[in-house]
């Protein structure tokens, strides 16, 4: 293996330590593989390589000196547009499949099945029923669950093009629903939206880049619908998150425990594993693990159990291979999405078991344990016992757990934020937030979303941008691997607020934190959950917009994805634009091969839907542009 300089791979000290260990042991990681891919294809990076039919692949010369059309006659604008919207559709399919899984579980529960699950948050269930117009008076709980499941599954089944998805219609501001409805951007059916996107991008179909991009925005709104229903139903099923103190980074692993990582996105299994682990503690101790069982999280599954159970977060997407390198990981249990196929190859060098659980997501070299919700506890016990058995194969001489970890205050659901505000004003909880936006103590709000990528130093842009905006009194929210970056860097603490927040923001967070009984300020970055939980920020923003009597596109609210990587992130960014948010991406999407498409998403979209993309790889200038967008919105509100 070629020597690799690990110093600039990640801003996370734990990651650097483990990468040096990988280097010393000739173990290949994502950073090594990225280096071997250089130089990456310029045609693909610009979106100018088309592989849609077997006459290709066709490449368009970005400089205009070579081919201008594919064999079928598609020009650069069509090629770029249809590949972009296909990526958005794939992201939508991933998030909505997650949501479908939860909705089907709710349906089974309403029918008296799935005895290992129950409705843990009845108050949230009744709140959802009110939102969706389901009668509750004098009705049994399971009947209400059944109606909610039916309405939700209807968003995957409805064939009436004039009837928008129920969750979107009920959850957005009336002005946004009307605006998007008039533009034809409200999907009627999640599955149909994905299917239609694939159909219209088949060879010989839609060749109008503007029409294609509008179709992309429509399917992105289906992604928001799928995320909304996944988040809300998960809260009813597993509990709505409330603030909890946890910890983050590889130092959360324990030498004297059976360490089990849950990695992926769906809480159906990981939540049960957290419940069952306590029951098998004595078995772990009997096997020699004096500290019992230690569950740790990776990626969005990690955030699901972190905010509901206080489970510590080991790391985010790009460094998911590194917990194996500690020599102290007994098992990594994975379900769906963002799971590296390299994991079993690295695990072969250690005692770690990589356990896949979803029949649609298997990995060569991993051990597959099929997960059946009807036997959830039994499956969880099987997996945990596999990890306990692996503990006996651990080589103590190879254990190298980094000492570094950070305290993290997490679990700020929309309900938790409102509850904290209610400590200041019980009669009108949103008033303190509105008042402080109006008086300028809070200039605006930024939502950090998205992934990690090897194209930049891991986590660095997140941290730099958040500090820059917080200093200018911008309230910072985060989900997914963005939240993981902040947790690992210690920005989800009261101490970070004291150190980095501007005076206005610091005063607000201190007042609310003290009133809420935290004994100090709210954390600098507020953890809202996993990637589907971006819908929590939308719920909070919608409540704020409705209170002010404005649309979402009027609010001083922006989004940022400094390390945008996955197709899901493109879907998230696209619906953020569609609901009216200026949205920054720090990885250049494959659109620069088309001036028309680039202008559509960065300029024309602003006139059409209110939101637009800001593409900037430099955190400093990106922060300036986001802050300028916030100031433009404030001016529009007369602030």
Curated annotation (Swiss-Prot):
Residue positions binding [4Fe-4S] cluster 2: 50, 53, 58, 72
Induction: By carbon monoxide; under anaerobic conditions.
Entry keyword Cell division: no
TM annotation in the entry: none
Topology of this chain in the membrane: Peripheral membrane protein
Outcome after substituting residue 265 to V: Great decrease in activity; diminishes incorporation of nickel. Displays hydroxylamine reductase activity
GO molecular function annotation: 3 iron, 4 sulfur cluster binding; 4 iron, 4 sulfur cluster binding; anaerobic carbon-monoxide dehydrogenase activity; ferrous iron binding; hydroxylamine reductase activity; nickel cation binding; oxidoreductase activity; peroxidase activity
GO process annotations (BP): generation of precursor metabolites and energy; response to hydrogen peroxide
Tagged with keyword Coiled coil: no
Main location: cytoplasm
Amino-acid positions noted as binding [Ni-4Fe-4S] cluster in the UniProt annotation, renumbered to this chain: 265, 300, 338, 451, 481, 531
Needed cofactors: [4Fe-4S] cluster; [Ni-4Fe-4S] cluster
Binding annotation for [4Fe-4S] cluster 1: 41, 49
Enzyme Commission number: 1.2.7.4
Keywords carried by this UniProt record: 4Fe-4S, Cell inner membrane, Cell membrane, Cytoplasm, Iron, Iron-sulfur, Membrane, Metal-binding, Nickel, Oxidoreductase
Family: Belongs to the Ni-containing carbon monoxide dehydrogenase family.
Oligomer and partners: Homodimer.
Name recorded for this polypeptide: Carbon monoxide dehydrogenase
Organism expressing this protein natively: Rhodospirillum rubrum
């Amino acid at each position: 293996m070629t020597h690799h300089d690990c110093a600039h791979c990640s801003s996370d000290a734990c990651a650097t330590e483990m990468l040096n260990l990988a280097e010393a042991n000739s173990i290949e990681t994502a950073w090594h593989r990225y280096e071997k891919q250089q130089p990456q294809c310029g045609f693909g990076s610009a979106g100018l390589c088309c592989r849609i039919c077997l006459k290709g692949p066709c490449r368009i010369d970005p400089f205009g000196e070579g081919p201008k059309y594919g064999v079928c006659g598609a020009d650069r604008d069509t090629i770029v547009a249809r590949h972009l919207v296909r990526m958005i559709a794939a992201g939508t399919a991933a998030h909505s499949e997650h949501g479908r899984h939860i909705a089907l579980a709710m349906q089974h529960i309403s029918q008296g099945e799935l005895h290992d699950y129950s409705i843990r948050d009845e108050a949230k269930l009744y709140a959802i029923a009110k939102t969706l117009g389901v009668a509750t008076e004098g009705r049994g709980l399971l009947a209400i669950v059944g109606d909610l499941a039916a309405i939700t599954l209807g968003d995957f089944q409805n064939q009436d093009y004039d009837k928008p998805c129920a969750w979107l219609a009920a959850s957005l501001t009336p002005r946004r629903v009307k605006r998007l409805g008039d533009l034809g951007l409200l999907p009627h059916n999640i599955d149909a939206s994905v299917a239609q996107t694939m159909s219209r991008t088949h060879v010989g179909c839609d060749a109008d880049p503007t029409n294609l991009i509008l179709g992309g925005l429509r399917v992105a709104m289906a992604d928001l619908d799928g995320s909304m229903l996944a988040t809300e139903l998960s809260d009813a099923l597993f509990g709505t998150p409330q603030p909890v103190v946890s910890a983050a980074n590889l130092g959360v692993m324990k030498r004297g425990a059976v360490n089990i990582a849950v990695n992926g996105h769906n809480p159906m299994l990981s939540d049960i594993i957290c419940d069952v682990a306590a029951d098998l503690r004595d078995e772990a101790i009997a096997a020699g693990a004096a500290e019992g069982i230690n569950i740790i999280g990776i990626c969005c599954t990690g955030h699901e159990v972190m905010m509901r159970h206080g489970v510590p977060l080991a790391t985010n997407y790009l460094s998911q291979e590194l917990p194996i390198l500690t020599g102290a990981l007994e098992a990594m249990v994975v379900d769906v999405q963002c799971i590296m196929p390299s994991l079993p190859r690295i695990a072969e060098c250690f005692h770690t078991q990589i356990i896949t659980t979803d029949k649609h997501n298997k990995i060569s070299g991993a051990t597959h344990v099929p997960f059946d919700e009807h036997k959830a506890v039994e499956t969880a016990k099987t997996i945990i016992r596999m990890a306990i058995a692996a503990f006996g194969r651990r080589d103590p001489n190879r254990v190298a757990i980094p000492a570094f970890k950070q305290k993290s205050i997490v679990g700020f659901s929309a309900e938790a934020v409102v509850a904290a505000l209610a400590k200041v004003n019980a009669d009108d909880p949103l008033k303190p937030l509105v008042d402080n936006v109006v008086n300028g103590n809070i200039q605006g709000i930024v939502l950090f979303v998205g992934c990690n990528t090897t194209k930049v130093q891991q986590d660095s842009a997140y941290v730099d941008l958040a500090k820059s905006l917080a200093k200018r009194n911008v309230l910072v929210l985060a989900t997914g691997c963005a939240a993981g970056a902040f947790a690992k860097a210690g920005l989800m603490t009261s101490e970070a607020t004291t150190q980095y927040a501007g005076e206005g923001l610091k005063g607000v967070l201190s007042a609310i934190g003290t009133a809420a009984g935290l004994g100090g300020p709210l954390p600098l970055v507020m953890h809202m959950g996993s990637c589907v939980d971006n819908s929590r920020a939308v719920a909070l923003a919608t409540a704020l917009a409705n209170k002010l009597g404005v649309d979402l596109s009027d609010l001083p609210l922006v989004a940022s994805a400094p390390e945008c990587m996955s197709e899901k992130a493109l879907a998230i960014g696209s619906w953020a634009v569609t609901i009216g948010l200026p949205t920054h991406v720090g990885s250049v999407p494959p659109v620069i091969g088309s001036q028309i498409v680039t202008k559509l998403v960065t300029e024309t979209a602003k006139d059409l839907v209110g939101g637009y993309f800001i593409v900037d790889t430099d955190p400093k200038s990106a922060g300036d542009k986001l802050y300028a967008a916030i100031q433009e919105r404030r001016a529009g509100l007369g602030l």
